[in-house]
């Protein structure tokens, strides 16, 4: 059974803190295994990559078979159902339209002292996109990760996708083909992350790695960060639904399960001001679980990590939401707009009863790669700026340098950095 809490109960605060502190991340043995895999790929390159791929994905490969040929990509994409490809194309159009609005503008101006100041944006040169291939395969993630990179102007976009038992999802290949990814490798897990970060004889290294994955992939991204950039450390999926009694309990139950079905470690939380409605949602969850193909995963997630929280009013709810800082926040209430304005910490907010989180996962337009594990307190969802770098520009002539340098010399001397001061003083004609 999910945890049930009420703000009216004396023990609420302690129980809520325990809910926030519950660990759903990877264990030490995962970190140790990932370290060994990364060290192996860094040291032995293709040989280690092939060895791990053969072991974990149960497929016999050689270095010359790691990369998919253009013919393999096209043939795989052709096997995708046409109506689903059409849906992917609609999603791609909407995702691109939204993300084009994120493109930043540069700055270039001359200040009153005559100093030219500015900043410019340039795309990252090479990005690796990790696409999962485990308990579920996600062509939508290809679009959500690749399209912002393409909009940003990334020149080289590399995709890795595991092929368990030699099988690749046709829709994943169709999505890759749709966004123009031509460099695809049939590898996954920590070994794929290592190959993208360190490079091998077959795979040139990239500058940044993005994309979701399991605990091993998350641990690998954490370990290679610094050598390459990463988008974020994605933990298990989360949803928090704020709902009143005017909702259909079956709708809200399905919304909760939409994240619970991702992973046993996923978390679904319902906050409501009506105990009878909350009970009805819990009953609806049980009914849905009798029918869902991924019921075993969803049931484990709901029973082990789910929670129902009863509040007196939306003031209490907003305070709790900000403490949870959920990845996905549904506001299935009449006052959705006004409550949304008061929420400070959420990866994405879905407004009203007719905006289920699932519409954002696929086709609304904003990115579905969002901060988890309470990191929405300081992080944002994936976007165009994640694939760009900002460089600042400073230009002085003799007059503007003469106006600014004396103050800079004083600061350099105060910090004991005499060469700094000297480089300025010499330009002023001081010995």
Tell me what each language-model feature is.
Residues 144-155, 177-179, 197-203, 221-223, ...:
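Alpha-helix C-terminal capping segments
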Residues 180-267:
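Conserved NAD(P)+-binding/catalytic subdomain of aldehyde/semialdehyde dehydrogenases
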